[in-house]
Amino acid sequence: MAKATAKNSAKQPKYIFITGGVVSSLGKGITSASLALLLKSRGYKVFMQKLDPYLNVDPGTMSPYQHGEVFVTDDGYETDLDLGHYERFAGVQCSKASSYTSGRIYSSVLSKERAGHYLGGTVQVIPHITNEIKDAFRSAAESGADIILCEIGGVAGDIESLPFLEAARQFRFEVGVENTCFIHLTLVPYLKAAGELKTKPSQHSVAELRNIGIFPDILVCRTEMHIPQEHLDKLALFCNVKPECVIEEKDVKDSVYAVPRELSKQELDLRVLEQLHLSVHPIVHSEWDSLVKKATQPKYECTIALVGKYIAIRDAYKSVHEALQHAGMANNAKVNVECIEAEELEKNPKLIKKADGILIPGGFGSRGVNGKCAAIRYARENKVPLLGICLGMQCCVIEFARDVLGWKDANSTEFDENTTHPVIDLMDEQKNVTEKGGTMRLGAYPCKLAKDSNAAKLYKSEKISERHRHRYEFNYNSEFRKELEKAGLKIAGTSPDGKLVEMVELKNHPYFEACQFHPEFKSRPTDPHPLFTGLVKAALEQKKANGKKPTAPSEKTKKTKTK
């Protein structure tokens, strides 16, 4: 055992397991990402994993209404939106090794069984599934990280999460207590009728973990209001956690990017380093504090209309919302995002007229396409700044072909296979694809920008790399392309071989940029994406040009928003 410990201390990375209790959607992703940022700020290299209990191999085929956004990594893996938080907060590069689901784990085990890997043995949850999960934990060590944070989805007590929790329990035993830290995120609700906070749900949640052999080292308590010390002491006593390791995580009012600062005040990172027997290096202050100040005390204000198909759930466009906030910080502005259902816009075009800028995000299927095209036409004709993303770019091409060139039946073959002007068509390599999951054009691809394009000015480069998630592209038919360009639609970016059109723009327009890729996936608070900063800057200028002073929101507005 002593030899194993010595070996671990030399080469073994440290693991932090983050679990959740009482209710779902507590913010494990934000908490995990914030902790990763704090540890990184103290000089440690971090890597992050998300383990989801659902049986889909990945979330790529799931409805946005059920799952929210599908976040795409550079290496082309479709993942949970929490990986977006990891990349935005901690600045880590997530990969396929960052995302595991029960479906992926079971699929791997069953494939091995079919190949005879288990030599006729009876395949069971323990040890085969749990061993596969532990292999997933170990795969993260290839990143070379000092500390690996593993967020386990679901709620303690759910049957779906049990294999992951059991694997984590075994893993601690195998690598040593000094190399692991268990953090349990729980809810301390406030009952208005009783006028008090309740700790009992958290006690029961920890009891669920203890029943399966997991004893949390740190308890992080989500709450609407300050938790009195006597309540924290009570939780420490009944949950068998050191008093200094019961951490309050109160709701932040203005910006989610204030969470790392609040957790730092509670010394969460120090408690973790103590548990992992790691040195407490001086924290390296970055521009994070100034970013939070810009987010909470903006000088200017503008409104961006987001014309989408899935606006009923904000998480469906999570990275888009965040990228707009990053762009707002870069422009010292508060960005009010007005979500407009594309189908409603078809019935009531006036919905968009108060916007200083327009954003058309991605999506699939024909529903709402006419509404998106109506928004694009309004932006084009009235010189309103516009950014189109993925389907948004395709709609920009369709609208231009219909309303400028007069090709009234111009369309995508996704929506109309019989159109005589298929300006958007299925990519050649997609035409023989029959399965849905994981078969799109996914991940980072290089793009060459036209030297004289506005896009090149925004990026300050003619060579870029962006993440994709689509099957359809601008039709490479030379006649279509020639006519569209002749009419004024500039091809601003293509694949390096020039065959795939990745960006289009209008020259005689204050800001009209459309891209086939998803720039929102690469935007960071510390490195906002140029296409979004350009949109917000143009929107502020548009507001000023229209005689509306782009000043900061009034105190009354701020209070209303806070509620």
Curated annotation (Swiss-Prot):
Pathway(s): Pyrimidine metabolism; CTP biosynthesis via de novo pathway; CTP from UDP: step 2/2
Binding site for UTP: 24, 198-203, 234
Positions with a binding annotation for L-glutamine: 65, 363, 391-394, 414, 471
Any single Gene Ontology cellular-component annotation: cytosol
InterPro entries reported in the protein's UniProt record: Class_I_gatase-like, CTP_synthase, CTP_synthase_N, GATASE, GATase1_CTP_Synthase, P-loop_NTPase
Annotated stretches, region: Amidoligase domain: 1-278
Sites where the protein binds ATP: 25-30, 82, 250-252
Binding site for CTP: 24, 158-160, 198-203, 234
Region listing for Disordered, in residue ranges: 542-563
Similarity section: Belongs to the CTP synthase family.
Database matches in HAMAP family: PyrG (MF_01227)
Subunit structure and binding partners: Homotetramer.
Name this protein carries in UniProt: CTP synthase
Gene responsible for this protein: pyrG
